[in-house]
């Protein structure tokens, strides 16, 4: 067996024989990242980070730049595809106990936070009506920070309101953060292969491993092909499926949209924020909705790694999935009954999963006569 590091990393990497399709999403995320970086570069070449020209420059890209419409749609819909893959990737980690590889899990959650920041900055760049107001509402949450809030907000905005300096710095951040994501992704993969992937049974896979290439690389290729095919179908036939109608109008600080909401992939966190009728409480809940994922490796009490043989934990996991979908749906609705109570119930259920996990693990140990 040759001992060349690159060959070992990509070809002769030993992987468990029984890993399922749920393990394909890492390579799909890598493809999404490559696609976003490439299309983002071509868009940045033609984009102008100025509040008077940004909206027009997007129209110029779509209408006048050769294949500009495709680059713009691939970048916008590619972001949605990125988040679909990352949420499934995290759900897989929660279900199969991948979080017990602590360093990999921590680097992954850090990646998620940077990715969400990058996507938020990107959403502001077209300078459409919803871009402007979503940026105003979300950045305004910084004012909830005691003592430092107003100073922090003014510092982020580069003035006393969202204006040209804000757009310029958001563009700079949106351009530079993907490089941080690329470097951290490399670290994420290196940390993963220190210990190796887990598997659906949650057992030690060392007794039965096969080379990554050709076995798992071809398996990855199938789902990658389906993802790219889906992406191209949406780009070609339904390019505006994820767009907000308000964002087809140029930003107007004097007209507030009837219902301000971010992109769909932030709606679960936005729904949790809205469910608390207090600015600081809502901002804390918003941050905690992501940060609570960091606690999972330390609250695992079950003797079994995976949820495959843990019916109570499975029930809570699928409750979490349905809760996530319900919060996302409720956050698209206006703040009025019955959506207020739906948001509050689902937000409570969301956090209940993380609180109940250690209790259920302990209970399942008792049921299976483990100490």
UniProtKB/Swiss-Prot annotation:
One of its GO terms (biological process) is mitochondrial electron transport, ubiquinol to cytochrome c. The chain crosses the membrane at residues 25-45, 69-90, 105-125, 170-190, 218-238, 280-300, 312-332, 339-358. InterPro entries: Cyt_b/b6_C, Cyt_b/b6_C_sf, Cyt_b/b6_N, Cytb/b6-like_sf, Cytochrome_b, Cytochrome_b_C_euk/bac, Cytochrome_b_N_euk/bac, Di-haem_cyt_TM. It is found in: Mitochondrion inner membrane. One of its GO terms (cellular component) is respiratory chain complex III. Binds 2 heme b groups non-covalently. Heme b b566 binds at residues 89, 188. It is a multi-pass membrane protein. A ubiquinone binds at residue 193. Keywords: Electron transport, Heme, Iron, Membrane, Metal-binding, Mitochondrion, Mitochondrion inner membrane, Respiratory chain, Transmembrane, Transmembrane helix, Transport, Ubiquinone. Its main location: mitochondrion. GO terms for molecular function: metal ion binding; ubiquinol-cytochrome-c reductase activity. Its cofactor is heme b. Heme b b562 binds at residues 75, 174. Coiled coil: none annotated. SUPFAM superfamilies: a domain/subunit of cytochrome bc1 complex (Ubiquinol-cytochrome c reductase) (SSF81648), Transmembrane di-heme cytochromes (SSF81342). Heme 1 (or BL or b562) is low-potential and absorbs at about 562 nm, and heme 2 (or BH or b566) is high-potential and absorbs at about 566 nm. Component of the ubiquinol-cytochrome c reductase complex (complex III or cytochrome b-c1 complex) that is part of the mitochondrial respiratory chain. The b-c1 complex mediates electron transfer from ubiquinol to cytochrome c. Contributes to the generation of a proton gradient across the mitochondrial membrane that is then used for ATP synthesis. Belongs to the cytochrome b family. The cytochrome bc1 complex contains 3 respiratory subunits (MT-CYB, CYC1 and UQCRFS1), 2 core proteins (UQCRC1 and UQCRC2) and probably 6 low-molecular weight proteins. This is Cytochrome b.
């Amino acid at each position: 067996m040759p001992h060349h590091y690159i060959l070992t990393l990509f070809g002769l990497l030993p992987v468990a024989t029984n890993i399922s399709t749920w393990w394909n999403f890492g390579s799909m995320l890598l493809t999404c990242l490559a696609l976003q970086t490439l299309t983002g570069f071509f868009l940045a070449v033609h984009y102008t980070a100025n509040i008077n020209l940004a909206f027009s420059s997007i129209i110029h890209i779509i209408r006048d730049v050769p294949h500009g419409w495709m680059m713009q749609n691939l970048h916008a819909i590619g972001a949605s595809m990125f988040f679909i893959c990352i949420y499934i990737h995290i759900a897989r980690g929660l279900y199969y106990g991948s979080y017990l590889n602590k360093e990999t899990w921590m680097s992954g959650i850090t990646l998620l936070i940077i990715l969400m920041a990058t996507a938020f900055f990107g959403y502001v760049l077209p300078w459409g009506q919803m871009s402007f107001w979503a940026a105003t509402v979300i950045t305004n949450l910084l004012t909830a920070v005691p003592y430092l809030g107003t100073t922090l907000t003014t510092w982020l905005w580069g003035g006393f309101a969202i204006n040209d300096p804000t757009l310029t710095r958001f563009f700079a951040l949106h351009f530079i953060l993907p490089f941080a994501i690329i470097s951290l992704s490399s670290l994420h993969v290196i940390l993963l292969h220190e210990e190796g992937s887990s598997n659906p049974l949650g057992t030690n896979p060392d007794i039965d491993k096969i080379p990554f290439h050709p076995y798992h690389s071809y398996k990855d290729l199938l789902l990658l092909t389906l993802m790219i095919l889906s992406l191209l179908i949406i780009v070609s036939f339904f390019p505006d499926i994820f767009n907000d109608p308000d964002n087809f109008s140029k930003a107007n600080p004097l007209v507030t949209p009837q219902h301000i909401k971010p992109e769909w992939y932030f709606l679960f966190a936005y729904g949790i924020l809205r469910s608390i009728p207090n600015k600081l409480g809502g901002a804390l809940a918003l941050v905690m909705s992501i940060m609570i994922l960091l606690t999972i490796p330390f609250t695992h009490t079950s003797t079994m790694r995976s949820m495959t043989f843990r019916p109570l934990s499975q029930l809570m996991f699928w409750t979490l999935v349905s809760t996530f979908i319900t919060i996302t749906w409720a956050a698209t609705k206006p703040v009025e009954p019955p959506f207020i109570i739906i948001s509050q119930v689902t937000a409570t259920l969301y956090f209940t999963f993380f609180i109940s996990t250690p209790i259920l693990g302990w209970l399942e140990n008792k049921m299976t006569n483990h100490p």
